[in-house]
Regions:
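Polybasic, low-complexity association/targeting segments
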Residues: 1-4
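Serine-esterase "nucleophile elbow" of acetyl-processing enzymes
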Residues: 9-90
Length: 281
């Protein structure tokens, strides 16, 4: 696998801030004024190891102002609990929301960090009662915690999954209520919503989200766009990714620039850019 110089992207990809939010986003900063689109999501929307993620491709092709609020390892809490970000969402003509996993948000069983949603902060009394034998101080990330809970007691783990899924649907509905313009839900993954959503090993995002959960949002008026990346599609873009040797493992979990180009082409008609963008051959 080719490893390019990470210097081309710069440290943290030109971080910028919006309003009073303490979260850093990928630059360059776009002023949230007039007509604009906003993109919310995790690693793929942020565009880790990619020079031009799909929000930038759409902006260039459609000639629109596009605010990329994608954030590495983001969960829904990053947005629904930040007034500055919700204000941007409410003012957007179109809001594209990448479907994010259900593990990275606070719920009845545990609390996550308000900005780094993949960080496990503490277990609730309810979870401690469900798993009295677990030392929760040993875990710092939500995925590792869930893997341990599943291994300890698959039966109790199903109760946790049920709670996370219910909380995810409620949180998504809350976020969609803040959208004044058109809302587009983007399923961007290497698996279909019908596939195993409980695979906890690296990859498999959005974790724990399935078709039933998407169907529960059908009455919100949001449009659903599904893009399931094939292995060939992912592999064909690897050479164009930019990362250091230390980042190789993380880069292998990303879908890559070919997928971003294809996704941009799928979304282009929503922005009047259907004739300007063509999917790669």
């Amino acid at each position: 696998m080719h490893v390019a110089s990470a210097a081309r992207l710069g440290p943290d990809y030109q971080p910028c801030h919006y309003g009073r939010s303490k979260v850093s986003f990928r630059g360059p900063r776009v002023e949230p004024a007039g007509r604009y689109a906003v993109f919310l999501g995790g690693n793929e929307t942020f565009g880790r190891f990619i020079e031009r993620p799909f929000p930038a491709l759409i902006a260039a092709a459609a000639g629109i102002a596009a605010i990329n609020l994608g954030c590495a390892n983001a969960g829904l809490d990053l947005y629904v609990k930040d007034p500055s970000l919700l204000e941007i969402v409410a003012g957007a003509e179109t809001a594209v929301i990448q479907i994010m996993g259900a593990q990275n948000m606070s719920n009845r069983f545990y609390v996550v960090h308000p900005r780094r949603n993949d960080r496990f902060v503490r277990a609730s009394a309810t979870l401690k009662a469900l798993y009295p034998e677990v030392d929760f101080t040993e875990y710092h990330f939500t995925r590792h915690l869930l893997m341990a809970l599943r291994d300890q007691s698959p039966g109790c783990f199903e109760l946790v999954v049920e709670e996370l899924r219910a909380a995810w649907v409620a949180r998504m509905r809350s976020l969609l209520e803040q959208v004044s313009g058109r809302a587009i839900l983007l399923w961007l993954s290497d698996r279909a919503p019908e596939d195993d959503a409980e695979e906890l090993s690296p990859g498999g995002e959005p974790l724990l989200v399935n078709r039933e959960m998407l169907a529960a949002l059908a009455d919100t008026g949001a449009e659903l766009v599904e893009h399931v990346a094939s292995p060939a599609e992912i592999a064909s873009g690897r050479e164009a990714m930019i990362y250091s040797e230390l980042e190789q493992a993380a880069a292998r979990e990303m879908l890559g620039p070919r997928v971003h180009a294809d996704v941009a082409a799928r979304l282009a008609p929503f922005f009047g850019a259907g004739h300007e963008m063509k999917r790669p051959a």
